[in-house]
From Swiss-Prot:
One of its GO terms (cellular component) is cytoplasm. Pathway: Cofactor biosynthesis; NAD(+) biosynthesis; NAD(+) from nicotinamide D-ribonucleotide: step 1/1. It is found in: Cytoplasm. GO terms for biological process: NAD biosynthetic process. GO terms for molecular function: ATP binding; nicotinamide-nucleotide adenylyltransferase activity. Disulfide bonds: none annotated. Belongs to the archaeal NMN adenylyltransferase family. This is Nicotinamide-nucleotide adenylyltransferase. HAMAP family: NMN_adenylyltr.
Amino acid sequence: MMRAFYIGRFQPYHFGHHAVITRIAEEVDELVIGIGSAQKSHEATDPFTAGERVLMLYNALENLPVRHYVLPIEDVRYNSIWVHHVASRTPRFDVVYSNNPLVIQLFREAGFCVKESPLYVRERYSGTEIRRRMIAGEKWEHLVPKPVAETIKDIDGITRLRNVSASDSNFSL
């Protein structure tokens, strides 16, 4: 049995992530999906909590044809111990999928087999671009699976994102 690991911040989970995970699922028997920077939320670049992101993925991946686990992974201060940190919080895995140079380097140094993730149209499917559209009031729902858009609406995520992204330069005490 082949079990793979894939990590992302998923702020928010979008069709680019979905395409990558769907392709990985064609090559493995099980998939461990790490919600990276799990401790971060309520920030302009990380507006959603780990629990909200778990829910987004759980709902969006309901029909994924392989067994999968969605687990929060907090950051650690030292890159040299990060792989051990990840491994201690996940089921054992045989291969890591990533295009992130640091993730690739750290897992290879730790002796893991690393494969590059299948590519997607990053210019179109980007968490940064989706968050920008949300703040600007532009259409964004077509860039994420329907259950993700529903989750964001249910938690009033756009209001939160706008509030945490707003400057307080016009306010004085």
